[in-house]
């Protein structure tokens, strides 16, 4: 197998980051980065292309499952189920606990299979109304939603968890369950940090408040059917050794959910909408796979391992560090998890780190910098509350603190105590 130098792998990452910052499509940015890095790293054109194709092939099963998950996502978003869940939670907790309600609503939406940026956009109209009534700053409500979304993301059947489960050959539910305790710590920190920001930054004006149509929303219980069915089907493998692949479980959950809401006749339009949400992620992951193909077959792994050995740090630290670094490079939980898992999974297993521990720590680590400005999440979330770039940038340390908290807790559980 052709090996690329560590310098070549670093060049691949730098070129990819530079192009993404220049608003080039992330998929193209990573493809070009992989090509340039491979050539500079000592491989010829044919060898570089072979490494890129090999890396992309390694991620095709995850891509198939992500496309299938579009049915569940489409049903949740288009049927009004996501709005129903949000309305119920915020109404139950009331205005006095508005920040907790927003964090919890976004966490639950993300945990049941809604993309984290879509979850924030879904909750934002309610957040703006609560902010106006309770005199909360935009920074406080946005941090509450983002922190809740990050917490939900590491225990969800979303593309990031699918990528980690596929690479480490684990049941999807195992990766989801591994994120529950770190997510709860992340939620608690989010609430306390958001409370500190109540009077900092700009406030919501009357004209920014959006009135939602709530008359035709499904009930809270029927809204939960789709994700619950999907999770129960996935849970059959660890509980009873009955394997129902996410390729089947996620769309089937969406179908049954649509039936229970009395909206089965709309399933095709829901599926098409969900597919449109998943397609950019699937395409990006193919670019991610190509980049991972170069990095995985480079000397960069050895450089990182030697650095760990010289520092005296334990070998399991490679998992969260790789997740953190790749999320910084890609500004995406999904891409960060996919690259780190594909590049470092075999090394972690050789170092004695279990599959679940490696997947859990990489997954948590990938939430630390997934909100950086060269990714779409930064701009989509800021736009959801009409926040300007300067004010949005000030939230980055708080978002990173939430991701870091979840990473530390995950590392303690799976690295230090080896549960």
UniProtKB/Swiss-Prot annotation:
Pfam families, sorted: GntP_permease
Transmembrane segment boundaries: 1-21, 24-44, 66-86, 101-121, 174-194, 216-236, 242-262, 280-300, 311-331, 349-369, 396-416
Major localisation: membrane
A Gene Ontology cellular-component term: plasma membrane
InterPro entries cross-referenced by the UniProt entry: Glcn_transporter
GO molecular function terms noted in the UniProt entry: gluconate transmembrane transporter activity
Keywords from the named record: Cell membrane, Membrane, Transmembrane, Transmembrane helix, Transport
Cell compartments where the protein resides: Cell membrane
Top-level taxon of the source organism: Bacteria
Entry membrane topology: Multi-pass membrane protein
Family: Belongs to the CitM (TC 2.A.11) transporter family.
Cited PANTHER family: GNT FAMILY GLUCONATE TRANSPORTER, GNTP FAMILY PERMEASE
Protein name: Uncharacterized transporter HI_0092
């Amino acid at each position: 197998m052709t090996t690329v130098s560590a310098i070549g792998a670093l060049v691949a990452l730098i070129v990819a980051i530079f192009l993404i910052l220049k608003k080039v499509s992330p998929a193209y940015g990573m493809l070009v980065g992989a090509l340039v890095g491979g050539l500079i790293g000592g491989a010829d054109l044919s060898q570089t292309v072979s490494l890129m194709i090999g890396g992309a092939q390694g991620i095709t099963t995850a891509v198939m499952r992500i496309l299938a998950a579009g049915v569940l996502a489409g049903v949740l978003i288009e049927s009004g189920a996501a709005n129903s869940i949000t309305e119920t939670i915020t109404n139950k907790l009331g205005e006095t606990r508005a920040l907790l309600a927003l964090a919890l609503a976004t966490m639950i939406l993300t945990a049941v299979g809604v993309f984290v940026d879509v979850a924030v956009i879904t909750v934002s109209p309610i957040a703006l109304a609560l902010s106006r009534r309770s005199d909360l700053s935009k920074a406080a409500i946005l941090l509450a939603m983002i922190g809740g979304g990050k917490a939900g993301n590491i225990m969800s059947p979303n593309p990031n968890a699918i990528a980690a489960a596929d690479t480490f050959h684990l049941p999807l539910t195992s990766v989801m369950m591994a994120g529950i305790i770190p997510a709860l710590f992340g939620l608690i920190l989010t609430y306390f940090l958001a409370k500190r920001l109540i009077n900092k930054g700009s406030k919501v004006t009357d004209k920014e408040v959006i009135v939602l149509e709530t008359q035709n929303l499904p009930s809270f219980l029927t809204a939960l059917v789709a994700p619950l069915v999907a999770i129960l089907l996935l849970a059959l493998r660890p509980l009873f050794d009955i394997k129902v692949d996410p390729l089947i479980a996620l769309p089937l959950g969406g179908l049954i959910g649509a039936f229970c809401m009395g909206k089965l006749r709309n399933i095709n339009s829901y599926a098409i909408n969900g597919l449109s949400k998943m397609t950019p992620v699937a395409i990006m992951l193919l670019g991610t796979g190509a980049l991972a193909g170069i990095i995985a077959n480079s000397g960069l792994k050895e450089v990182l391992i030697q650095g760990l050995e010289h520092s005296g740090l334990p070998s399991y630290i490679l998992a969260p560090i790789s997740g953190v670094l790749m999320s910084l490079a890609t500004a995406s939980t999904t891409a960060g998890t996919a690259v780190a898992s594909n590049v470092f999974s075999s090394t972690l297993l050789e170092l004695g780190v279990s599959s679940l521990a490696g997947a859990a720590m990489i997954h948590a680590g990938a939430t630390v910098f997934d909100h950086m400005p060269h990714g779409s999440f930064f701009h989509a979330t800021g736009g959801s509350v009409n926040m300007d770039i300067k004010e949005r940038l000030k939230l980055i340390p708080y978002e990173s603190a939430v991701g870091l908290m979840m990473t530390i807790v995950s590392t303690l559980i799976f690295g230090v105590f080896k549960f």
